[in-house]
Amino acid sequence: CVTLSIANKNFYSYSNIMGILKQTAFNAFLATGMLLCLITAGIDLSVGANAVFCACVMGAMNKAGGFSGILMILVCMLVGALVGCVNGLLLTRLRLPHPFVSTLGMKNVLWGLALIVTNSQMVNNFPQSVQWLGKNTINGFPVSFILVILMYVVMHIFLSRTSLGRSIYCTGGNLEATRLSGINTANVLTFCYTMSGVMAALAGIVSVGRSGICNGAN
């Protein structure tokens, strides 16, 4: 597929390259959040469902009316963070054996909640402030792609230059040794899954901004 795509003369067209950058932003945000979980030797299987659920929360607010686009975005990110925090607490406080179990269950719960909050209907006509992140460009480059690059830079600095970033690596390397060295591994893990939820929410916002719709059934 890669060879045939590159061989196509239209592959290098400006519109196609910009389209690819816009489409990859969704997965890029999910991957940024997932990175933290993977470093701690865990995984978050609920990121896709979390993104859809956060988008559907925005859809429910848009359908109800009376909410600004900025408020929708803030609530969306708060909901994503809350879901991620619950994932972290299930792992650290209830001491479930592996995040595979808790996040897999959370994924199914979120799919159901996405259908409930939208009443299984597609929602459209979002404010321009919401669609700006997914559709607009700055000097020809998609806003969502620029935000992804900035997020990558910030994440690199955070993981390599801060004590919390190093604690995340230590937790993934040897959880018990890290705990015995005085690092609160429970808080570190909860932070990682909370950030995964925030990144999932950003992915949901970008998805709504690019398509202009949200659909709990998809």
Where would I find each of the regions flagged by the language model?
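Hydrophobic positions within alpha-helical transmembrane segments of bacterial inner-membrane proteins
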Residues: 32, 36, 49, 73, ...
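Single transmembrane alpha-helix segments in multi-pass membrane proteins
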Residues: 2-9, 14-65, 90-95
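Transmembrane helix-bundle core of multi-pass membrane transporters
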Residues: 99-162, 188-191, 207-218
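Alpha-helical transmembrane segments within multi-pass membrane transporters and channels
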Residues: 66-107
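Inter-helical junctions in multi-pass inner-membrane proteins, predominant
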Residues: 7-19, 158-160, 165, 193-218
